[in-house]
UniProtKB/Swiss-Prot annotation:
Cystine pairings recorded for this chain: none
Protein name (record): Protein nucleotidyltransferase YdiU
Binding site for Mg(2+): N270, D279
Entry's EC annotation: 2.7.7.-, 2.7.7.108
Lineage: Bacteria, Pseudomonadati, Pseudomonadota, Betaproteobacteria, Burkholderiales
Residue numbers binding ATP: G108, G110, R111, K130, D142, G143, R193, R200, D279
Class of enzymatic activity (EC top level): transferase
InterPro entries, per database record: SelO (IPR003846)
GO terms assigned for molecular function: AMPylase activity; ATP binding; magnesium ion binding
Protein's organism: Cupriavidus pinatubonensis (strain JMP 134 / LMG 1197)
Amino acid sequence: MSDTHPSQTTPRDAADSVATLSAPFPTMPGFAELGERFFTRLRPTPLPSAYLVSVAPNAAALLGMPVEAASEPDFIEAFVGNSVPDWADPLATVYSGHQFGVWAGQLGDGRAIRLAQAQTDTGPWEIQLKGAGLTPYSRMADGRAVLRSSIREYLCSEAMAALGVPTTRALSIIGSDAPVRRETIETAAVVTRLAPTFIRFGHFEHFAAHEDVAALRQLADFVINNFMPACREAAQPYQALLREVSLRTADMVAHWQAIGFCHGVMNTDNMSILGLTIDYGPFGFLDAFDANHICNHSDTQGRYAYSQQPQVAFWNLHCLAQALLPLWLEPGADEAARDGAVAQAREALDPFRDRYASEFFRHYRAKLGIHMPAGGDKEDEPLLTSLFQLLHEQHVDYTLFWRNLARISSADGSGDAPVRDLFLDRAAWDTWAESYRNRLRAEQSDDAARRVAMLAVNPKYVLRNHLAEIAIRRAREKDFSEVDRLLAVLSRPFDEQPEAEAYAALPPDWAGGLEVSCSS
């Protein structure tokens, strides 16, 4: 949906302009029903010379929106924030949070403006413009996002959805020639994001920090009523809410680990109450396997390293539990009552570790093409532990390993070359492969059926940093064809796509010098 000579629009007066873009969906108040202590109504700040970079067909389908609409000037005007459709109710929400383990106070929305809440056949979708300008919560920032980070978020949102990972979605990128100062001067862009809700742990932390229990209760009730109605039937609805968020978060992080995804900045304000992957910043997919991989060069202590993600998620859930504690307490509650509330919160969080472990083993059994053993998950630990140690020591490409593993034979090593050649120490591979083959033979594995099943869960294509970088470099020259091409490939990550073989290759040597940070 983009070309090398994009159409451009000139912003009208943001205070008065109304876009004529019609909506193929009804809207509802959504977050706006909470009232203005939770948000500020405002209009986006216009961007000059706006042009379409790309639109995601699968995300557009969620809204029932024809992709062809993206070529219309009114689409660009509305989704860059230059004008406000009559169906929109733009607002910025307020939240706080912990950053790198330290309380940081009020954080946002610093540059994201909710445009509307759509109600479609696929469910409720909050439509949000990221990079749409200053809000009352911007602190010292400029309210903008840059083309570089916008392309990364856009592509990864849709790639993760295609991989089956819980995630926010991305409808479009609209760029501008307006300069934005980061580590260097870059150009601005706006990503239109979609999610049932963008409520974060940090929304609850904000009102807990301000001791506004009424607002905290109202927010919790809103989440329960709209997204987790089963919690209403529980004896302790708020405890049930915390438990449900804990389970969803465990599922999400287990899936991250299985596909080799490193988020990079798991602050509590970047944690979705629905257990969605949110805020794609300095993320990365593993190339050579390194259990301690740090994808964010701003993370000097490795707090958010790949191996630390499950523990950090649990720590963040404790922050959410702390914020929700007042909902279990009556005014003037004594120490015994508080101890009881803490015990209830711990009880709600207790299932996290077991759920994470269960999902972790489920994903990896599927990746290995093996079944649950009679002895349960514990029986699989030696096979997996020895594999992870081998991958780590040999710096084996994570995605290529799993994809090629599907092709080996359970009978002998005659077909091992595609995966065996990834190892410097071939003898070490041979030793592990024999234990793996023994497992396959014990299960009387049918190689053809196993291969089909493994190829359906081990992607051939992921958003490696160098692929995103190539698309970004071309986009800076107003050539957006690589963004669209990469989006199309990543939308079918498990398919062979012979014409896209280059996107599945090992990273080039120059990719090792790429760094991503919180600068976006």
